[in-house]
Amino acid sequence: MKWVTVDRLPQYEGQTVELRGWVQNYRSSGKIQFIIFRDGTGVCQAVLFIKDVPPEVFEAGKRLTQESSIIIRGSVRKDDRAPGGYEIGVQDLEIVQIAEEYPITKKEHGTEFLMDHRHLWIRSNRQVAILRIRNEITMAIHQFLQENGFVLTESPILMGTAAEGGATLFETTYVNDEPAYLSQSGQLHVEATAMALGRVYTFGPTFRAEKSKTRRHLIEFWMVEPEAAYFTHEDNMRLQEEMVTYVVRRVLERRSKELQLIGRDTTLLEKVEPPFPRITYTEAVEMLKKLHKPGDEWEPIEWGEDFGAPHETVLTQQFEKPVFVEKFPVKVKAFYMQPDPENPDVVLGADLLAPEGYGEIIGGSQRIHDPELLKRRFEEHGLDMNTYGWYYDLRRFGSVPHSGFGLGIERTVAWICGLEHVRETIPFPRLLNRLHP
């Protein structure tokens, strides 16, 4: 008998198949037992009629508990009333394990309780849908970049220096007793591989010990960081809007059921297409001043100050599509960003803010390629030339203009799924006060 998965049941209508999975729910009405069955690919209803199965099979069904693991064999029939639209007429039931009393029941549970039981909570329909959408986003990014000539490369997770100035580091001790740090970004190393391969990207976890307890912050999160030789600031933004559009369209096309299950209104997602609106940092500062009203919980900023999450929220509410905010002051951005030749007080960099209040999902820039300018930036930021000597070498041996960006996977998932908090975007989130499970 063929072992099939729930998502493939429409292909086997009228046939007898085997399914392997778990009991999501169970009820009995005397001579009929109803099992809501899940296997990770979907949910279906399995029905045991006392007259259709041997007595020992019907008795086995009475023992089932929530999350018991089972193997069922039976005929596939279409039933629009059943979850998933298909039903299994059970002919045989094999119990793999009877689960103990399951802690997550139909009643409402608080967030902390669910996070304490995250290893079990991820089995719920909503969490499965979110994780499938996350997978679709990840695979779409890989496919887009590969099709556009980018080579996947790896940056180290153990670093001898910090990639981003100002962010808090996780420090450990290396084998020779020198300090080492968990990576905050793969960017500096991916700049080196871009000089070897032309167009590259790295995809991996990053770690920032920021004491931020907001709906947008994780201590450990995943980033994709493309870098391309000879790319300008304009090329960089064009790549970003093309990639984000590709990802959103792919999710809408392939994960519509999951989006519907989690209750996502896709009206604005369907409007995502190039070109994205662009405003300068200076225009954004002025916009915030005009939008501010007495009694607002946020205050406008002056030119030269960085945005906070409330400012990004307000800005994104003015646009239906993701919006670029570009040309930030030099002093609020990282040392490696290329100044604008038309105005050296600002950099050729941009943040891409997702609409509906989600804020920054991408930060990117053209990088400094002039060795003397980079040396001055080292001095201004108090960076040790010996420590960053290898990075400086990239400007000594065939330096070229180049650009790149970092996209945060969790924030992107939160936006596309319409989630209140990033904690649901990854199987086991690492939050300010949560290291377990």
Swiss-Prot record:
Its EC number is 6.1.1.22. PROSITE patterns: AA_TRNA_LIGASE_II. The keyword Aminoacyl-tRNA synthetase applies. The keyword Iron does not apply. One of its GO terms (cellular component) is cytoplasm. It is found in: Cytoplasm. GO terms for biological process: asparaginyl-tRNA aminoacylation. GO terms for molecular function: asparagine-tRNA ligase activity; ATP binding; catalytic activity, acting on a protein; nucleic acid binding; transferase activity. Keywords: Aminoacyl-tRNA synthetase, ATP-binding, Cytoplasm, Ligase, Nucleotide-binding, Protein biosynthesis. It catalyses: tRNA(Asn) + L-asparagine + ATP = L-asparaginyl-tRNA(Asn) + AMP + diphosphate + H(+). SUPFAM superfamilies: Class II aaRS and biotin synthetases, Nucleic acid-binding proteins. Homodimer. Belongs to the class-II aminoacyl-tRNA synthetase family. NCBIfam families: asnS, PRK03932.1. This is Asparagine--tRNA ligase.
